[in-house]
């Protein structure tokens, strides 16, 4: 199993716990900015890539939800969207797969790309069932400049959280 598959499986296990990963990062840090973007640019179609449990999405967004670690949302999206949202996701992906995932995000976007990345180790430690080995939830921890080099474009909004 390569590191991408390992972290995907760790995320699947973690998402099964109803007490973890509620998507509060989106709710607490990004909804207002995203709503302003939607209104200002008359955005009609939205993809949340890495939506997690999708507990805090405003219903008026009518977003397409995708998360390969959540069975309910694991069907890959089709087409392009006016806005692609990807918050608190990329730091959970091994470095050797970042460029591929960013390319996917850009392919799904026919308009705006809103990305938020955390640049520090996570408080969460992930484990596989029946294993003592613990993995930090943030596998790719890089400075902001590193992320800026990989995620850039005319209609890209890149935010950082601590």
Predicted regions: what is each one?
Residues 1-81, 99-102, 108, 119, ...:
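Conserved N-terminal segment of class I S-adenosyl-L-methionine
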Residues 85:
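A conserved beta-strand element that flanks and buttresses the S-adenosyl-L-methionine
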Residues 89-92:
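Hydrophobic adenine-recognition pocket in adenosine-nucleotide-binding enzymes
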